[in-house]
């Protein structure tokens, strides 16, 4: 089983406070009905970190919400 660490995510997002904010916002999106972008049987927070480490989610310019690959395809 692969372990996810904050260091794995910081390769994509260098600001750890922004990283935490992104993970929280992504968990809120799951609870609103968004689907996970990676296969994971873990808790929501771990799934969010896996998505960030995989580059599947990115912060928007104002960090109000997290953009997913699906958001980019819709544009």
Curated annotation (Swiss-Prot):
Q: Name one GO molecular function term.
A: DNA-directed RNA polymerase activity
In the UniProt record, the signal sequence range is none
This protein's source sits in the domain of life called Bacteria
Q: Which InterPro entries match?
A: DNA-dir_RNA_pol_omega, Pol_omega/Rpo6/RPB6, RPB6/omega-like_sf
Q: Where are the membrane-spanning stretches?
A: none
Q: What class of enzyme is it?
A: transferase
Q: Which reaction does this enzyme catalyse, per its entry?
A: RNA(n) + a ribonucleoside 5'-triphosphate = RNA(n+1) + diphosphate
One GO location term (cellular component): DNA-directed RNA polymerase complex
- Which protein family is named in the record? Belongs to the RNA polymerase subunit omega family.
Which purpose does this protein serve, as stated in its record? Answer: Promotes RNA polymerase assembly. Latches the N- and C-terminal regions of the beta' subunit thereby facilitating its interaction with the beta and alpha subunits.
Supply the name of the protein.
DNA-directed RNA polymerase subunit omega
- Please name the source species: Nitratidesulfovibrio vulgaris (strain DSM 19637 / Miyazaki F) (Desulfovibrio vulgaris)
